[in-house]
From Swiss-Prot:
<protein>
    <recommendedName>
        <fullName>Uncharacterized protein F34H10.1</fullName>
    </recommendedName>
</protein>
Length: 63
């Protein structure tokens, strides 16, 4: 389990990403750069950067 950082996305993650992209598209352009939106999107930009990022995202979705 050492190399869990570079895992292919599951279908659930893909769906989540698509939802986020739709959400961002609906927002006015000046809000897209806000830090909250960037925090939401940044884990998806290059896959999950590492395991704690993945855990944080899962926690954010669950809570």
């Amino acid at each position: 389990m050492e190399n869990s950082c570079r895992q292919p996305r599951t279908t659930q993650e893909k769906k989540k990403r698509k939802k986020l992209q739709m959400f961002v598209r609906l927002m006015p352009k000046n809000q897209r750069k806000s830090s909250i939106v960037q925090k939401l999107i940044s884990p998806f930009k290059d896959g999950f950067t590492c395991k704690e990022e993945k855990q944080r995202l899962c926690f954010a979705v669950v809570s």
